[in-house]
Structures are given as structure tokens and as C-alpha cells.
């Protein structure tokens, strides 16, 4: 079958591309009930193909890349919950970065189709670096027509779930996979960190340093090995859906010029295969959300690496995480219903814009570049400085919190540093809490103020990192308030 994202995927193709299991179930607005009646808890699932026609731009590098093949299809996966009084939808999209207007367009269509208001829909990118460009970052620009198509497909995923509701039971919990997450920002021996693209030698840490280098000192922060789990099953015990959350940036051992959902899609397929015997042929959906992984990846820099064939690391990570989720699933205590609540708040944050000598230097570098493509990191970030100079002085940032029973979910539209996710969990009013990053928009990296002082790639001023230094503190404070709001 030729994968064509601009046509409707048939049911047979849908089964083939979603782990071999039909995926659809739903939610409706609560109906009027007689006194004393209790509406059954219901959950719905859907999986929609978002793979584009080729060739197409792939975001995720300093230079644009063109995809000419597809290793595995891209999807928008959806879970919808209904307790008879409130409804929530969670959508995970196989993409690197999705700008807010795309999500807003999708949510507008969702409300028109289903009645679900925007605050009751959490939609996020997974952060695969082999997805389609829908947000301008570095030298990649949005693929014409794909943003509108993607918004429609996200809405279709929710609408499909809304139209196939079935009774369900719900549970939540967590496990741990410590062996697949590593902090990628390292302290190095004095004098061994290269100058940054702005010509300064002030960075105190280096992202992705040489592996097993004698110049390594120690990682600049922790990791979060937690795998959080939201699970749904039917009253007869057959599994219906699992949403997992893991703080791992992406894996990325793909072939060149090939689209892939990365380990997020591999995880969905692996868990579906593990669940298949228990599912007994009934629909089941697995999906992975990205936690707080702005400074985390899958590389153990303390050891020399051994290169494997393409996709081998993705497969290994997916298998490790899926096996842990599968084992923990067996221990979950399911219940017949759960409180559902949501809250959204928009805050305004300042932009770190270049000016004066910094901007003059950037213009001189770009003018001297052989172009039109910028080839060196100095040229790339000079171009970013020029583009960032046209940004407003402040930007709105949407924040969201969900309550699902005694589980709290924070949603932030940034590549969030792991310290922030750990703090939100520790300070949450819920026993179980996790954060989904890159949700409802894209506002670049979110380092803590302490990490801003250390410098390094994630702090370098660009369209990928532009929020004010105090942004993390302000976002964390607002998220704590939102979690408290949905808890009450």
C-alpha cells in the first residue's frame, strides 16, 4: 500500500499500521440520568495515520533534511475518558515539535465535532526527530499543507474515539527503567569545552560530549527513571489501552532520509504484542508520552559506544520500557470509575532577544556565509539571532493540568529539564504525578535558572531556546497551582 497522508486510511490499512489490532472507542456528553443512576465509566481509543506523501522536510537538526522513505508510519494516538460527568481526551502525535496554532486548530475542530472544550483536550508531540516539519526551527520550515492536515487528523482521532465508546475500568501506577536514561549535559575538565557559537568560552557544561573521554568529570544533573502508567481495561478484564510516560528525549538511530516514529512507535507495537494474548482479538492501544527530557538522552557517555544496525537501539529501548510496563500492568488495581478534571492557564513570559553588538555580529556572520544554507554552528546561531530579533518582547505560554482519579498530569509546551519534572512530582498534591512536555504548543527548551548559569546548547539563544531565565520558576509555580486546583 502506498502511504498517502492526504487520503483517508481504510480500516484494513488502519489495522495493519496500528500493531495489528483495531483501535477505536469513545466518549459522549453525559446524558440525563434518573435519580440514583450511576453512569458507567467509559474509555475510548483511536489511532490515525499521519504519514505524509514524499519527499518531505524532517525537523530535528541544524540543517534541513529531506525524507524520501518511510521505515514505520507516523500516527496520532488518542485516549478519551468519560465518567458520566466529565470527559477528557489525550492525544500523542508522532512529531518533533508542533506549534500552538496547529493544536488550536485541532481543538477547535474537536469542539465542533464532539463538544469537548479545548481545556479538556491534552495534545502533545512525542519528539521523534524523524517526523514532518510543522514548526520552523533552525533551517527547517513547515511543509505546505501539512499543518492543516495534521490538525484535521488530530481532530479525527478524537472524533473517532468519541464514536466508539465502551465501558471500562481504570488504573494508574508506575515502574522504573533506569538503564535507558542518561543526563547529556556534562561538567568537563577546565579548558576542554569548545567556545559556543557566539564566540564565548563561558559554558561550564557540554551537551553530548565525546564518549568515554578523559575530559569527562560528571553529569550536571539527575535522571528520572520512572515509567508512569495510565491503564484501561474492559469489565471482562481484556486490556483496552495504556498511556505510558518516560523522560527520554528520543533515540534516533535511524537510517538517513527516512521517516520513523522512533522508540515511541516501537513501544506502542511492542506493548500491543505483549498484550495480544490477553486482548483476545479485541482492540487495544498503547501510546507513549514524553516526560521531562530536555537534558536527558539514551547515551551513556561514560562508556565507549558500539555502533549497531539502524533501529537496534530504538528496538532495545522500546522492549525494555514495554516489558516494564507490561509487568507493572499485571499488578495494577483497577477501579470502576475516577474523578476527571482539567484546568488551563496562560502566562506571559519574556523573550531573550539579541540586541546591539550581538545582533551586529550575527548579521556580519550571515552576510559572510557562503549560503544560502548555514554550514557551521556559528552561522546557524547567527541566523537564529537575526530571526529571534523579530520576536515579540513577551509570549503567551499555555499550561494545563489534568486529574484522573488520584493521578495528576502536568502539560507544558517546552522541552522541559528533568529537575522540573522531579520537583513537580515531589510537590504535587497527588500520590502519582507525571509531566507531558511539548504539549499544546512549542516554546523551546525550559532549563532551570541554575542550568542557564551553566550554559550549554539548551540555553543558547535561538528559536529553540528563547524564554526568559526565570521561565522555569514561573511555570513550575503555575503548574503547582493548577494541580492544586484540579485536586480540589
Protein language model features and the residues they cover:
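N-terminal signal peptide c-region/cleavage motif recognized by signal peptidases
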Residues: 29-31
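Conserved beta-alpha junction segments in alpha/beta enzyme cores
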Residues: 37-124, 128-285, 289-316, 329, ...
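N-terminal secretory signal peptides
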Residues: 1-9, 17-27
Amino acid at each position: 500500500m502506498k502511504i498517502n497522508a492526504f487520503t483517508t486510511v481504510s480500516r484494513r490499512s488502519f489495522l495493519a499500521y496500528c500493531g495489528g489490532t483495531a483501535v477505536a472507542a469513545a466518549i459522549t456528553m453525559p446524558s440525563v440520568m434518573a435519580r440514583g443512576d450511576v453512569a458507567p465509566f467509559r474509555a475510548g481509543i483511536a489511532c490515525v495515520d499521519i504519514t505524509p506523501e514524499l519527499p518531505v522536510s524532517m525537523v530535528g537538526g541544524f540543517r534541513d533534511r529531506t525524507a524520501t522513505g518511510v521505515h514505520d508510519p507516523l500516527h496520532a494516538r488518542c485516549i478519551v475518558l468519560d465518567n458520566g460527568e466529565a470527559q477528557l481526551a489525550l492525544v500523542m502525535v508522532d512529531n518533533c515539535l508542533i506549534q500552538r496554532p496547529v493544536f488550536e486548530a485541532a481543538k477547535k475542530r474537536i469542539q465542533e465535532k464532539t463538544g469537548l472544550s479545548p481545556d479538556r483536550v491534552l495534545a502533545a508531540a512525542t519528539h521523534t526527530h524523524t517526523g514532518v516539519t510543522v514548526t520552523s526551527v533552525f533551517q527547517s520550515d513547515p511543509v505546505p499543507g501539512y499543518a492543516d492536515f495534521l490538525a484535521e487528523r488530530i481532530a479525527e482521532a478524537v472524533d473517532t474515539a468519541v464514536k466508539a465508546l465502551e465501558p471500562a475500568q481504570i488504573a494508574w501506577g508506575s515502574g522504573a527503567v533506569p538503564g535507558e536514561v542518561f543526563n547529556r549535559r556534562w561538567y568537563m575538565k577546565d579548558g576542554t569545552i569548545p567556545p559556543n557559537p557566539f564566540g564565548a568560552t563561558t559554558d561550564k557544561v557540554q551537551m553530548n560530549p565525546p564518549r568515554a573521554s578523559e575530559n569527562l568529570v560528571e553529569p550536571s544533573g539527575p535522571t528520572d527513571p520512572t515509567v508512569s502508567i495510565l491503564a484501561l481495561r474492559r469489565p471482562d478484564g481484556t486490556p483496552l489501552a495504556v498511556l505510558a510516560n518516560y523522560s527520554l528525549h528520543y533515540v534516533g538511530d535511524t537510517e538517513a532520509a527516512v521517516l520513523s516514529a522512533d522508540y515511541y512507535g516501537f513501544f506502542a507495537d511492542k506493548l500491543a504484542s505483549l498484550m495480544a494474548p490477553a486482548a483476545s482479538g479485541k482492540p487495544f492501544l498503547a501510546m507513549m508520552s514524553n516526560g521531562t527530557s530536555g537534558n536527558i538522552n539514551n547515551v551513556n557517555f561514560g562508556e565507549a559506544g558500539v555502533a549497531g544496525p539502524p533501529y537496534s537501539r530504538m528496538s532495545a529501548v522500546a522492549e525494555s520500557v514495554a516489558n516494564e510496563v507490561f509487568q507493572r500492568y499485571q499488578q495494577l488495581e483497577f477501579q470502576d470509575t475516577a474523578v476527571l478534571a482539567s484546568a488551563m492557564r496562560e502566562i506571559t513570559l519574556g523573550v531573550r532577544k539579541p540586541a546591539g553588538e550581538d545582533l551586529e555580529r550575527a548579521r556580519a556572520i550571515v552576510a559572510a556565509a557562503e549560503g544560502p544554507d548555514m554550514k557551521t554552528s556559528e552561522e546557524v546561531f547567527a541566523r537564529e539571532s537575526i530571526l529571534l530579533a523579530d520576536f515579540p518582547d513577551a509570549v503567551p505560554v499555555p499550561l494545563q493540568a489534568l486529574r484522573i482519579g488520584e493521578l495528576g498530569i502536568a502539560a507544558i509546551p517546552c522541552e522541559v529539564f528533568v529537575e522540573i519534572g522531579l520537583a513537580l512530582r515531589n510537590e504535587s498534591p497527588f500520590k502519582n504525578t507525571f509531566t507531558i512536555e511539548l504539549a499544546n504548543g512549542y516554546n523551546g527548551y525550559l532549563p532551570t535558572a541554575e542550568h542557564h548559569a551553566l550554559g550549554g546548547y539548551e540555553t543558547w539563544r535561538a528559536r529553540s531556546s528563547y524564554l526568559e531565565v526565570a521561565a522555569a520558576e514561573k511555570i513550575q509555580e503555575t503548574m503547582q497551582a493548577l494541580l492544586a486546583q484540579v485536586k480540589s
